[in-house]
């Protein structure tokens, strides 16, 4: 038997509005509970997992409180807060998994979880011997790196050939989980002539510029942001591909830089996740006048190609074209620090992370 700590939804939030993180407030969005779990509770096909790492993703905002039922149904009071993670199998009544196996799963914000037979179908067994640390499967070999891969190879339809080399890229949210890998793919695979990397604050600007001499960082918090963005690009109508993770005024400023018939790839809109008014896009006329190609990205649309993509990402890591140390930030959520799990996730929206933000819940063996 194990005593699981679980963060559950306490109060149903208003879709699009900020969550309440004041844990002693009766109106708090979340509640930390404890629950006894044991192998005796397992039904046929089920697993008992110990969570090792949790992935922190902006999209969890909508997994918890849905604004669009086509994307996610949301969470009801008493249900565990959803999150992807890595866990160790403690007990199994499923022939495909044995105690001691590590798996990628939707664990939720919990130290231990029973995975139903229905959800076992989405599990992926992880080979610990192929990586230095298991958290690599959430960073350079995880969903955000897969997103970056598909942006280039599927949505932009780029190939490793001369005609696709030397392009100019604009990347917003460039210091984040998707952005850092996009910078490296642009530079190290597609030989970008320039990457304009938008990040928040001088430290983040210095971080994105550390990826290479062809990277020009621009601070979106700077009062002269729009002018400095134009200067970094060398003027308007200079960018071939704009990979946007932010939305709002950053998106509107970036569209000005795109060439005619350039491509805008919409990957996220983190600036609007706590303020729906920022979903408004005022640059629609430029889509028409510049004849832009606009594509929206959901990584799960490409699930059949995950094995191929992971092989490629693994090769890029092996050959030093993706830097492991610059691709993730780890936070400690072990023991009593598990109480900080919601606050660690909240840090995404104030930009505490460089690369993928991962919470450690239990030690690897």
From Swiss-Prot:
One annotated Gene Ontology cellular component of this protein: cytosol
Bilayer topology: Multi-pass membrane protein
Q: Which GO terms describe its molecular function?
A: oxidoreductase activity, acting on the CH-CH group of donors, NAD or NADP as acceptor
Q: What is its main location?
A: membrane
Which sequence ranges are marked TM in the entry? 134-154, 170-190
| InterPro entries according to UniProt | ADH-like_C, ADH_N_2, GroES-like_sf, MDR_fam, NAD(P)-bd_dom_sf
Pull the Extracellular topological domain ranges from the record: 155-169
- Subcellular location, record wording: Membrane
Q: Which Pfam families match?
A: ADH_N_2, ADH_zinc_N
Keywords, sorted A to Z: Membrane, NADP, Oxidoreductase, Transmembrane, Transmembrane helix
Q: Which residues lie on this side of the membrane: Cytoplasmic?
A: 1-133, 191-365
Q: What is this protein called?
A: Uncharacterized membrane protein YML131W
Q: Give the organism the record lists.
A: Saccharomyces cerevisiae (strain ATCC 204508 / S288c) (Baker's yeast)
